[in-house]
Amino acid sequence: MSWKNKPFLLKPAGKDYLWGGRRLKDDFSKELDMEPLAETWECSTHPDGPSIVSGGAFDGKTLTEVLKAHPEYLGTHPRSEGELPILIKLIDAKQDLSVQVHPDDAYAKEHENGSLGKSELWYVLDAKKDAKLVYGFYHDMEKQVLKESLLNGTVEKYLQKVSVQKDDVFYIEAGTVHALGAGALVAEIQENSNVTYRMFDYNRVDKHGNARPLHVDRALDVVDLKGSASPRQ
């Protein structure tokens, strides 16, 4: 068999976001030198965390480099040079993720240097008994009321919270306010984008004592204000 026809293994890129835990190391034997380990980007050509080929003819190269050198791997009509249209990751939420929203493709293209927007799908690999997630609002919201609640820290009373169980599937369309809750372990398939507008972060600080930045104005540009969305697919 020619090397061109052989599959190859990938090493993931890791992310040490403050809400992560150890399950990706303990349950999946991920050998990444970071603590906590919040996410592993298993199949990625995104510049913020490309996967690295492990072994074989392409050992040590990024997946992006391989696909640029061999565009035939992407078929006859690749969308862009060396890039996959999706990104696949594992997520370990030891703590709640920030309340956030992602733009659609049109908004991201105009306001985020031509980036894709971000719709995503979560498959729940495991979840603690009391695990929940935020998915949209309890009822229709007015933009000014939402803005005020974000600025004064009362937004949680408007958020629709949903219990999470193993094998649940959730589709998070661009524009949907959402947050993965503590105790959930998920696999995510998403558009190849890292554009996130953080709306509320529970007044947390990072390991340096700094509050993480919020993106309220852009979030208000893209958020879907309709309430009572149906989360499960």
Features from the language model and the residues they span:
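Transition-metal
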Residues: 1-141, 201-233
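Conserved metal-binding segment of the jelly-roll/cupin
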Residues: 99, 164-182, 191
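Short helix-capping and hinge/turn segments at secondary-structure transitions, especially at repeat
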Residues: 175, 194, 225-228
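Gly/lys/ser-thr-rich phosphate-binding loops in alpha/beta enzymes
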Residues: 22, 87, 159-168, 176
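A short hydrophobic beta-strand segment most commonly corresponding to one strand
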Residues: 120-121, 179-203
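Active-site glycine-rich loop that binds ribose-phosphate moieties when present
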Residues: 141-171
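Short, well-ordered, mixed-charge alpha-helical segments that flank or form enzyme active sites
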Residues: 107-108, 130-135, 141-146, 172-173, ...
